[in-house]
Amino acid sequence: MEKGQMIAIDTQALQWEERFNEKLGRALYRKNLVTDPDTGMEIRLVRYPAGVINVRHTHPCAHGMYVIEGTLVTHAGQFGPGSFVWFPEGMAMEHGATADRDVVVLFITNKPFEIHYL
């Protein structure tokens, strides 16, 4: 991302990138949209296949998920399309998809993304 340049991305034209998660024994899918070189902030589309829940973990970054399709299942409840869920930095959490349907979210971090399983 160049400073001072607008970015427009046709997300429909991007291919889903498969990311195998050894802890879960399943793949998750993403489309990377933007990474800010100054702050490390990241924006991506993430798809959790039906039944996949990312087990208890933390991040050294805050992050939000805007639900586009399906239902986001979290340790605090379920959230459908149009919902925005914010997770503070360091919070222990679980999130993923319902058993019967994939969930697609717009995933936004405030700095570089890392995951630490508990």
Where are these regions (language model features)?
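Short glycine/proline-enriched turns and hinge-like loops at secondary-structure junctions
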Residues: G40, T58-P60, G77-F79, T98-A99
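Short, well-ordered beta-strand segments in beta-rich or mixed alpha/beta enzyme
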Residues: I43-Y48, V67-G70, H95, V105-I108
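Glycine- and acidic-residue-biased ligand/ion/polar-headgroup-sensing regions
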Residues: A50, H59-T74, P81
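Ligand-binding loop in jelly-roll beta-barrel domains
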Residues: Q78, E89-H116
